[in-house]
From Swiss-Prot:
Cofactor binding, per record: Binds 1 Mg(2+) ion per subunit.
GO terms for MF: adenylosuccinate synthase activity; GTP binding; magnesium ion binding
Protein's name according to its UniProt entry: Adenylosuccinate synthetase 1
SMART domains in UniProt: Adenylsucc_synt
Residues involved in IMP binding: 13-16, 38-41, 133, 147, 224, 239, 303
GO cellular component, one term: cytoplasm
Catalytic residues, chain numbering: 13 (proton acceptor), 41 (proton donor)
Species assigned in the record: Laccaria bicolor (strain S238N-H82 / ATCC MYA-4686)
Keywords noted in UniProt: Cytoplasm, GTP-binding, Ligase, Magnesium, Metal-binding, Nucleotide-binding, Purine biosynthesis
Length: 428
């Protein structure tokens, strides 16, 4: 089938955008299936001969290909003002998205009051806050699950929308007290936004099935990552949607048999943003080195990312659930200067190995992490263009990961530039 899926395999920020950008050069439709504008992909591409940096949050980053159509699927939650702010910013930089960006009529809506509530919930949690982006994503998905949310199609029946919207806000007042919010002003604002949004709205299920059955190449761009999945991540320090291969099917309305390839994106070390367990975290000079050399600051929030060694327990868990056909190992160049590199291989409790990745966070907080130490290569790989030219120890690191996961690494990121990606031919 003509559907390729790119998914994050750790806690997000793996660098999915660059691979999507490369693959999007040869595809017809780039689709998002879950999440909202809490995601963050940065892509550097030439526009009219000038390198430009584009920050994507809600919109599919495959739009950098001027021949590619973007689709925001029904599994997303959409803050309409942010949708237009991002679209306007891209077009101001010279990226014309006219007649090639569409949004599902079934996608749920995020409102400003969701963002206010998101902040109030974090304050309420105090020292146990999750560390959300405060974009209102969680409260919007909560409304969806409780069947009280509003969807894109509701915008086009203004009287019904206004009635439902007032009830939604009143419900939040009852839960959180009366916070400052102009309900009637918002209703009027969305009346105008609805008319601007109308040309972008489609039946996304019919749209994507027509694309697939007519032979178009479809690329699905996953947001966040497996370890932030609502079911399989480090709950409750997770996002509020399905970030797995299953979320692709439910968020776009396509069956599993239509998916041809699933590519997992793996950072050469591990990072995460916000609270939650992180067994391989390095609160030492190594952690600082990875943070500084890797420029580990969030695209969406600007927050510093926590850093640690590559964790194979996490990746085995991720690979079992998503069934990767191949991997993209990113930011390998960040390890260039290190004389030795550690990889987390097992979690132990009282000397006994845990069989999988534990659901119990108290248990997870008390695991002993077993590491394997590999020799570094201590030379720059940034200008290398073929796999054979990589240093032997670098290839050894790659092979160790492949052998441990039984999944081939097909793409290797060797620098921040768009061209800094080495393709390794897979054995048939």
């Amino acid at each position: 089938m003509s559907v390729t899926v790119v998914l994050g395999s750790q806690w997000g920020d793996e660098g999915k955008g660059k691979l999507v950008d490369i693959l999007a050069a040869d595809i017809d439709v780039c689709a998002r299936c879950a999440g909202g504008n809490n995601a963050g992909h940065t892509i550097i591409v030439p526009i009219d001969g000038v390198l430009k940096t584009f920050a994507f949050h809600l919109l599919p980053s495959g739009l950098v290909n001027p021949r590619c159509t973007g689709l925001i699927g029904s599994g997303l939650v959409v803050h309409v003002p942010s949708f237009f702010a991002e679209l306007d910013a891209l077009e101001a930089q010279g990226l014309d998205c006219s007649n090639r960006l569409f949004i599902s009529d079934r996608a749920h809506l995020v409102f400003d009051f969701h963002q206010i509530v998101d902040g109030l919930k974090e304050v309420e949690l105090g020292g146990k806050s999750i560390g959300t982006t405060k974009r209102g994503i969680g409260p919007a998905y909560s409304g969806k699950a409780s069947r009280s949310g509003l969807r894109v199609h509701h915008l086009f029946d203004h009287e019904t929308f206004a009635e439902k919207f007032r009830k939604l806000v009143e419900g939040r007042y009852k839960r959180y007290g009366h916070f400052e919010y102009d309900t009637e002003g918002e209703i009027e604002r969305y009346k105008k936004l609805a008319e601007r949004l109308r040309p972008y709205v489609v039946d996304s299920v019919a749209y994507i099935h027509k694309a697939i059955t007519s032979g178009k190449k479809v690329l699905v761009e996953g947001a966040n990552a497996l370890m932030l999945d609502l079911d399989f991540g480090t709950y409750p320090y997770v996002t509020s949607s399905s970030t797995t291969i299953g979320g692709v099917c439910t968020g776009l309305g396509i069956p599993p048999k239509m998916i041809g390839r699933t590519i997992g994106v793996v950072k050469a070390y591990t990072t995460r943003v916000g609270g939650g367990p992180f067994p391989a975290e390095q609160l030492n000079d190594i952690g600082v080195h990875l943070q500084e050399v890797g420029r580990e600051y969030g695209t969406t929030t600007g927050r510093r990312r926590r850093c640690g060694w590559l964790d194979l327990v996490v990746l085995r868990h991720s690979s079992m659930i998503n069934g990767y056909d191949s991997l993209n190992l990113t930011k390998l160049d960040v390890l260039d200067q290190l004389p030795e590199i550690k990889v987390a291989t097992r979690y132990l409790v009282d000397g006994k190995e845990l069989e999988g990745f534990p659901a119990d966070l108290e248990l997870l907080a008390n695991v002993d992490v077993e590491y394997v130490t590999l020799p570094g290569w201590q030379s720059s790989i940034e200008n290398i263009t073929t796999y054979d030219d990589l240093p032997e120890n670098c290839k050894g690191y790659i092979k160790f990961i492949e052998d441990s996961l039984n999944v081939p690494i097909e793409w290797i990121g060797v620098g921040p530039a768009r061209k800094s990606m080495v393709r390794k031919e897979l054995k048939q």
